[in-house]
Design a protein with these regions (language model features):
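The feature captures the LRR N-terminal capping module
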Residues: 1-162
Length: 162
């Protein structure tokens, strides 16, 4: 005879999920059941095109890897990730970063390389904890002044003067 395990006995405390190179075309639903504990989510090298509204309920995230996908839009709900320390959205199809990214006050490392960006948001200097910014292979016209406390900026092969 089989018995269902009560929901309260299930392990809902998962801090890291690694779904890199899994040929995903959408964010798996099972990820959301760990919204209260998930701190690191790696979805790099898939075929994701969009991030659903529910995705931005993962408010405990500290590290988010979305590189090498086909994401076409970074929604303003990115502001929900106020504890995010590291963001990698390199090599996607993101044409602009929303102004609301300024709410990600804990952000220290950001990689926007390989996207069709021409500018960074006006609010970008509000990211005072930002120490590493990678913007390789994009067509930025200029970098905003006073961007965080940058220690390292990777701007190689850009079409802008350094």
């Amino acid at each position: 005879m089989f018995h269902c395990i009560p929901l309260w006995r299930c392990n809902r405390h998962v801090e890291t999920i690694d779904k890199r190179h899994c040929s995903l075309v959408y964010v798996p639903e099972e990820i959301y059941r760990y919204a209260r504990s998930l701190e690191e989510l790696l979805l790099d090298a898939n075929q994701l095109r969009e991030l659903p509204e529910q995705f931005f309920q993962l408010v405990k995230l500290r590290k988010l890897g979305l590189s090498d996908n086909e994401i076409q839009r970074l929604p303003p709900e990115i502001a929900n990730f106020m504890q995010l320390v590291e963001l990698d959205v390199s090599r996607n199809d993101i044409p602009e970063i929303p102004e609301s990214i300024s709410f990600c006050k804990a952000l220290q490392i950001a990689d926007f390389s390989g996207n069709p960006l021409t500018r960074l948001p006006e609010s970008f200097p509000e990211l005072q904890n930002l120490t590493c910014l990678s913007v390789n292979d994009i067509s930025l016209q200029s970098l905003p002044e006073n961007i965080g406390n940058l220690i390292y900026t990777a701007c190689f092969q850009n079409k802008m003067p350094l």
